[in-house]
């Protein structure tokens, strides 16, 4: 584990014997803050995620998030630059130093286009989808599931390549639920950690004897694909109106007709949004179908976003 030292008077912090200059705040969540910092040793920008740890469990979860990052060396999964635990009296902060992506998230891109009355092209969608699937394939191959895939958790690199972030909700891919108590525990966990409008149907009402597997990510991927196609998630408006998302996801999704999209893309989306998880495809099958559609290679002008 690295060591952190705050040098507040100079607006710098030291992590693993390297000094970083605070530039500005990037955002904040319930118990975390993200700052833009510059490495004074290399001139590169980084995102410093600071997680407030009130209890031992918080520290363990932050450590686990760092461990999840360290499992992967993959172009479509966010890498961890450094991790440390900072202590100030009874207060603890877990610091995750991450690469900074100036283009922001996939959601930022969807919103930017929507503001101009535009959408991602099908070629762009296919290329992005391929990268997201490859990231998920790597996660699933290690025996884990992401569990909180959504457009705001997908960064865009300099060439527009998708990079999966926020690994704090990751857990084992295959969960054998045996009994009502375990089912309720998992359901409560999902309510806290899996964004409601991207949450798979099987996580809203967990059965007392069932298997929850990595295909919860495939449902979420379908919601991401829908957002890329139509500028909003399939259940965003349901949630915003205050209607029941849990009820809405129990019915097969009706996909709007659009001349922008091929029947093959619509069929792909339809398969991801299969309510019965046992009938939902795994990522390797989706990858083979995507590769058969032959999206343009990275760097070709049609894929640039």
UniProtKB/Swiss-Prot annotation:
Mainly autophosphorylated on serine/threonine residues. Also autophosphorylated on Tyr-198. A lipid is attached at residue 2 (N-myristoyl glycine). It is found in: Cytoplasm, Perinuclear region; Membrane. Its main location: cytoplasm. The keyword ATP-binding applies. It catalyses: L-seryl-[protein] + ATP = O-phospho-L-seryl-[protein] + ADP + H(+); L-threonyl-[protein] + ATP = O-phospho-L-threonyl-[protein] + ADP + H(+); L-tyrosyl-[protein] + ATP = O-phospho-L-tyrosyl-[protein] + ADP + H(+). The modification Phosphoserine is found at residue 197. The modification Phosphotyrosine is found at residue 198. Residues 166-202 are annotated as: Activation loop. The active site is at 148 (proton acceptor). The modification Phosphothreonine is found at residue 185. Membrane-associated protein kinase that phosphorylates on serine and threonine residues. In vitro substrates include DRG1, ENO1 and EIF4EBP1. Also autophosphorylates. May be involved in secretory vesicle trafficking or intracellular signaling. May have a role in regulating stromal-epithelial interactions that occur during ductal morphogenesis in the mammary gland. May be involved in TGF-beta signaling. Able to autophosphorylate on Tyr residue; it is however unclear whether it has tyrosine-protein kinase toward other proteins. This is Serine/threonine-protein kinase 16. It comes from Homo sapiens.
């Amino acid at each position: 584990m690295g060591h952190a030292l705050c040098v507040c008077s100079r607006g710098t912090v030291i992590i693993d014997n390297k000094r970083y200059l605070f530039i500005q705040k990037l955002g904040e969540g319930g118990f975390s803050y993200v700052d833009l910092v510059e490495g004074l040793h290399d001139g590169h920008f980084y995102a410093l995620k600071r997680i407030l740890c009130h209890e031992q469990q918080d520290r363990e979860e932050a450590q686990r998030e760092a461990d999840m990052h360290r499992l992967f060396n993959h172009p479509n999964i966010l890498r961890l630059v450094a991790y440390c635990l900072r202590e100030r009296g009874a207060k603890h902060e877990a610091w995750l130093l991450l690469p900074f992506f100036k283009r922001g998230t996939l959601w930022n891109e969807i919103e930017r286009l929507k503001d101009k009355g535009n959408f991602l092209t099908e070629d762009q969608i296919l290329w992005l989808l391929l990268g997201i699937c490859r990231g998920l394939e790597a996660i699933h191959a290690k025996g884990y599931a992401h569990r909180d895939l959504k457009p705001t958790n997908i960064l865009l690199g300099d060439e527009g390549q998708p990079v999966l972030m926020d690994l704090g909700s990751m857990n084992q891919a295959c969960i054998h639920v045996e009994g009502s108590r375990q089912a309720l525990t998992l359901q409560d966990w999902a309510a806290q950690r899996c964004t409601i409008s991207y949450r798979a149907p099987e996580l809203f009402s967990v059965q007392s004897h069932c298997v929850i597997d990595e295909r919860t990510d495939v449902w979420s991927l379908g919601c991401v694909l829908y957002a890329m196609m139509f500028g909003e998630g399939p259940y965003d408006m349901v949630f915003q109106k205050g209607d029941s998302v849990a009820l809405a996801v129990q019915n097969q999704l009706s996909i709007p007709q659009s001349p922008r999209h091929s029947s093959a893309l619509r069929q792909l989306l339809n398969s991801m949004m299969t309510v019965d998880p046992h009938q939902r495809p795994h990522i390797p099958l989706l990858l083979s179908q995507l590769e058969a559609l032959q999206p343009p290679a990275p760097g070709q002008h049609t894929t640039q976003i």
